[in-house]
Curated annotation (Swiss-Prot):
Organism: Lactobacillus gasseri (strain ATCC 33323 / DSM 20243 / BCRC 14619 / CIP 102991 / JCM 1131 / KCTC 3163 / NCIMB 11718 / NCTC 13722 / AM63)
PANTHER family attached to this UniProt entry: UPF0398 PROTEIN SPR0331, UPF0398 PROTEIN YPSA
Protein name listed in UniProt: UPF0398 protein LGAS_1023
InterPro entries on file: YspA (IPR010697)
Pfam family, one: YpsA
The family this protein is said to belong to: Belongs to the UPF0398 family.
Length: 189
């Protein structure tokens, strides 16, 4: 198995509050292209992510769309039970729909949230059960992904563990590429 851990910013950290936000289109475009590249090179066959609102859920949505073209499995992992319990009804429904679409879902803890140790255990689990990672993250703009990024760097000290970073410059390039591709598709002259 060749397993990829995908994580990154939460939706609020990117000021994305709607599924119709153009930034979301660009993020999914960038993730889809990244996944396709790894799939075509035979470097992954599982895309594994968390359930946080933002990059993690969007990555799984993009991966699920690729299952029509590629032989890739998807997994949604949570650090504790009842992960979405405090979310509003709409976000809980999105989470539920996602759990029904992925190939595998589980929690790394058998208990609801009790302590930050569950989050550390989740990071350890993800590192030990994946072969590489990608983060949509910019070290110049730290946020929640900073903790996963630091855990990955520490893990790399004793393990071969490739990590790719898609930063804001990469997203800007993806936005320009997306715009160019769609301008050509819509050019009727």
């Amino acid at each position: 198995m060749k397993r990829l851990w995908v994580t990154g910013y939460r939706s609020y950290e990117l000021s994305i509050f709607s599924d119709k936000d153009p930034k979301l289109t660009v993020i999914k475009y960038a993730l889809t292209n990244y996944f396709k590249s790894l799939l075509e090179e035979g470097k992954i066959d599982w895309i594994i992510s968390g359930a946080n609102l933002g990059i993690e859920q969007w990555a799984l949505e993009a991966a699920i769309q690729l299952q029509n073209e590629y032989s890739v499995h998807t997994a949604l992992m949570t650090p504790y039970l009842e992960f979405s319990k405090r979310w509003n009804e709409n976000n809980q429904m999105k989470y539920q729909n996602l759990t029904e679409q992925v190939d595998f879902t589980a929690s790394t803890s058998n208990y609801p949230y009790m302590s930050p140790a569950q989050l550390k255990n989740y990071q350890s689990f993800m590192l030990e059960h994946t072969d590489r990672a990608v983060l949509i993250y910019d070290p110049e703009h730290p946020g929640k992904p900073k903790y996963d990024y630091e855990a990955i760097q520490k893990y790399q000290e004793g393990h071969e563990y490739p990590v790719d970073i898609i930063d804001f410059y990469d997203l800007q390039e993806s936005a320009e590429e997306y715009e160019e591709n769609h301008r050509q598709e819509n050019n009727f002259y």
